[in-house]
UniProtKB/Swiss-Prot annotation:
Record-stated family: Belongs to the class-II aminoacyl-tRNA synthetase family. Type-1 seryl-tRNA synthetase subfamily.
Catalysed reactions, semicolon-separated: tRNA(Ser) + L-serine + ATP = L-seryl-tRNA(Ser) + AMP + diphosphate + H(+); tRNA(Sec) + L-serine + ATP = L-seryl-tRNA(Sec) + AMP + diphosphate + H(+)
PROSITE patterns, sorted: AA_TRNA_LIGASE_II
Protein name, per record: Serine--tRNA ligase
Cellular component, GO annotation: cytoplasm
Sorted UniProt keywords: Aminoacyl-tRNA synthetase, ATP-binding, Cytoplasm, Ligase, Nucleotide-binding, Protein biosynthesis
Native source species: Polaromonas naphthalenivorans (strain CJ2)
Length: 444
């Protein structure tokens, strides 16, 4: 959520920065904001006047009583003043609720270093990497016609038909050594992020409440993208509250600090978790219908950092590097893209996407997204730290994939495929595979 004081101080500047997101929709209802703000000021002024009057009248009552004089008329004025004060306080609370509802639908302001643009076409390539020397980061061509991960994976245990039978479209079943390779990828990612990059591994619920999703920005704006595990009952009844399957473990991990004041000495907090993620993919009808690229259920190793505000952009670069290390150790060609204003997520101020090379498509596809949210989530979460002056200040939060496990499997199948139909197992994964070096086609 944006800092309301920033909007009060310089609304035109904030609107101009929001407009760089190049969205056809209007993010902030300026008229509604200005109307509420004007009423808030008027009610606030009247409240302060009433409080002053009440104090003056209370003194008069004391003086009259000390003289033995009748104070009933003044007491009646105090009673009336009290009723009006209560009414004003109630209206101020209502205004605050209405203002919060207005601001919850407004995305974060892009950082000044983010290029302006619309969609993927406006993104800027930062760097490329590949394991092949002398190619300037470009991928090397296979010596045979590459097959996509569906054609490579199905003979090895990738079963889309069974996933559809069990649940529906965009679900997958994996069997045998292929399922083990999928598991090996997640274990390898966790080991690197914990042992080499200092993240604390966490096990988290796969179901969260609406407060958690509101804190990280999925609610109220993106409810259609979520799978509801339980519809909400009557307000105020916790046992009947709405529950949702997590779209990413960013949600529970970031909510560790909701309503907390973290000692400054404990920053940064670095968390990682391997979880399934559940997304309805609303608005993605007809996109990536073949294979594992876009699924309703997929696994991901997530990285979350909670940092001092002065350190968040340093942390963004470091976290991007933490995701890159996974791809480098796997020997997968990739590129890093700086997202433009029109392609960034709702809560981000700046985002890097890592895109892995898929030879069958002869293109790069997103495999990780790493974002700095500054205080946007922290303000919704009321996540703070106590600074050197003893004052509470909002932390900055960052999140990123380290990596999407299914898409990494796709990249391994395509980049390590062999002409005989098998798949070479990357060297770093072989210890997790009991020493296996190859996924071979089953004997006829």
């Amino acid at each position: 959520m944006l800092d309301i004081n920033l909007l009060r101080k310089d609304l035109p500047s904030a609107i101009a920065r929001l407009e760089t997101r190049k969205s056809p929709q209007t993010f902030l209802n300026v008229e509604a904001f200005q109307t509420l703000e004007a009423e808030r000021k008027a009610v606030q002024i009247r409240t302060e006047e009433l409080q002053g009057q009440r104090g003056t009248l209370s003194k008069q009552i004391g003086q009259l009583k000390s003289k033995g004089e009748d104070a009933s008329a003044v007491m009646a004025l105090v009673s009336h003043s009290k009723a009006e004060l209560e009414s004003s306080a109630k209206r101020l609370e209502q205004i605050q609720t209405e203002m919060q509802a207005l601001l919850l639908a407004v995305p974060n302001l892009p950082h000044d270093s983010v290029p302006q643009g619309i969609g993927e076409a406006g993104n800027v390539e930062v760097r490329k990497w590949s394991p092949f020397e002398g190619l300037g980061g470009e991928p090397a061509a296979l010596s045979f016609e590459p097959r996509d991960h569906v054609d490579v994976g199905q003979p090895l245990g990738l079963d889309f038909e069974l996933g559809t039978k069990l649940t529906g479209s965009r679900f997958t079943v994996m069997k045998g050594p292929l399922a083990r390779l999928h598991r090996a990828l997640s274990q390898f990612m966790l080991d690197v992020q914990t042992a080499e990059h200092g993240y604390t591994e966490c096990y988290v619920p796969y179901i969260v409440n609406s407060d958690s999703l509101r804190g990280t920005g999925q609610l109220p704006k993106f409810e259609e993208d979520l799978f509801a595990a339980r519809k909400g009952g009557q307000e105020g009844q916790a046992e009947n509250a709405a529950l949702y399957l997590i779209p990413t473990s960013e949600v529970p991990l970031t909510n560790f600090v909701r309503d907390e004041v973290v000692p400054e000495a404990q920053l940064p907090l670095k968390f990682t978790a391997h979880t399934p993620c559940f997304r309805s993919e609303a608005g993605s009808y007809g996109r990536d219908t073949r294979g594992m690229i876009r699924q309703h259920q997929f696994d991901k190793v997530e990285m979350v950092q909670v940092v001092h505000p002065e350190k968040s952009y340093e942390a963004l670069e470091a976290m991007t590097g933490h995701a890159e290390v996974i791809l480098q150790k796997l020997g997968l060609p990739y590129r890093v893209m700086l997202l433009c204003t029109g392609d960034m997520g709702f809560g981000a101020t700046k985002t890097y996407d890592l895109e892995v090379w898929l030879p069958a498509q002869s293109t790069y596809r997103e495999i990780s997204s790493v974002s700095n949210c500054e205080a946007f989530q922290a303000r919704r979460l009321q996540a703070r730290f106590k600074n050197a002056q003893g004052k509470n200040e909002f932390v900055h939060t960052l999140n990123g994939s380290g990596l999407a496990v299914g898409r990494t499997l796709v990249a391994v199948l395509e980049n390590y495929q062999r002409a005989d139909g098998g798949v070479d197992i990357p060297a770093v994964l072989q210890p997790y595979m009991g020493g296996m070096t190859t996924l071979s086609l089953p004997a006829a």
